[in-house]
Amino acid sequence: MLTLLAILTVSYIIGSIPTSIMAGKMMKGIDIRNFGSGNAGGTNAFRVLGWKTGLTVTLIDIVKGVVAAVSVVAFFRHHPIGAFPDINEVALRLLAGMSAVIGHVFTVFAGFKGGKGVSTAAGMLIGIAPVSMLMVIGIFLLTVWFSRYVSVASIFAAVAFPLIIAIRKYVFELGGGLDYYIRLFGESFSFHDSLDYHLIIFGLLVAFAILFTHRANIRRLISGTENRVTFRKHA
């Protein structure tokens, strides 16, 4: 129990690192939550601080999720505080990753007002199912490129993840064929992709959570007032 508590606590602290807020202070001496959409995430960093800073913020937020789901769990597996928790490996990584996402959304370092957690959640899933997440990232990037709406891309990607896992597990894997080559591709890069059913359940919960946290964006999309991203450098 102490080991599980330590994993969740360390993951929460890592997730709580307020990347975009720190970037806003360093780059322009501002609190990014007072500009743009008012959100302390990578998307607003793109809008307010420019694409280079926005990309850096997004990548760091992704890394937070990877570290929580992979490195923190691995560390405490080798250095447990008492007995290591008897929990399914994928479920444990999901718990650690979600603790980081909660830290990102409710950061202890910035008055519990952080970002929406999309990038950190993506990082967690990259650490658990990298090949499936490559597909999701492809969907995300194509949607951003053609629509210029990060909110739409986030929603599409969130819905796509559990569908991809379910199709790979219950259609391609059972029937053989295509998923063998998908796995072979991943293993050629030392990617070990999980198709554990916990991921499908979690993916569905994340999809609903993303829809909930993007409800204001959805209202703006319907009214035609949602901000589009641009790829030009801001002054």
UniProtKB/Swiss-Prot annotation:
Membrane-spanning segments: 4-24, 56-76, 94-114, 126-146, 152-172, 194-214
GO biological process terms on file: phospholipid biosynthetic process
Enzyme Commission identifier(s): 2.3.1.275
Pathway(s) annotated for this protein in UniProt: Lipid metabolism; phospholipid metabolism
Catalytic activity: an acyl phosphate + sn-glycerol 3-phosphate = a 1-acyl-sn-glycero-3-phosphate + phosphate
Pfam families (UniProt xref): G3P_acyltransf
PANTHER family: GLYCEROL-3-PHOSPHATE ACYLTRANSFERASE-RELATED, INNER MEMBRANE PROTEIN YGIH
UniProt protein name: Glycerol-3-phosphate acyltransferase
Keyword annotations: Cell inner membrane, Cell membrane, Lipid biosynthesis, Lipid metabolism, Membrane, Phospholipid biosynthesis, Phospholipid metabolism, Transferase, Transmembrane, Transmembrane helix
InterPro entries xrefs: G3P_acylTferase_PlsY
The protein's role, per its UniProt record: Catalyzes the transfer of an acyl group from acyl-phosphate (acyl-PO(4)) to glycerol-3-phosphate (G3P) to form lysophosphatidic acid (LPA). This enzyme utilizes acyl-phosphate as fatty acyl donor, but not acyl-CoA or acyl-ACP.
Membrane topology value: Multi-pass membrane protein
GO molecular function: acyl-phosphate glycerol-3-phosphate acyltransferase activity
Native source organism of the sequence: Chlorobium phaeovibrioides (strain DSM 265 / 1930)
Recorded superkingdom: Bacteria
Any GO CC annotation of this UniProt entry: plasma membrane
Subunit: Probably interacts with PlsX.
Subcellular location: Cell inner membrane
HAMAP family for the chain: PlsY
Disulfide cysteine pairs (residue numbers): none
Family membership noted in the UniProt record: Belongs to the PlsY family.
